[in-house]
Amino acid sequence: MWHEGTIGVPKGDGKYTVVHYWVKAYDEPSQYGIEKGRISKLTLKISGEVVYNYDRGLDVPPQNEAAETALAILMYEYN
């Protein structure tokens, strides 16, 4: 199943970094999933720039703290 959405990651100054995500997660874990989990594809973008990408293997590691936070949220939700 594909899921798409937006996560607002607090910056600390009362503002948020907007992280758009696209995630493909299955009902069962897979050898191709992140940490052998259910997510097989995941893209995170901030202002149109890819800040994380996993497509059955890590392509772009988290580029900043907002990407790391969004990744943790999505891992909890879908993996």
Show the residue positions of the predicted features:
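A short, structured beta-strand/loop element
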Residues: 20-56
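Generic low-complexity segments that are intrinsically disordered, proline-rich and/or Lys/Arg-biased
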Residues: 11, 30, 62-63
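Negatively charged, low-complexity tracts enriched in Asp/Glu with abundant Ser/Thr
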Residues: 1-27
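Mixed-charge, Lys/Arg-enriched low-complexity segments
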Residues: 46-79
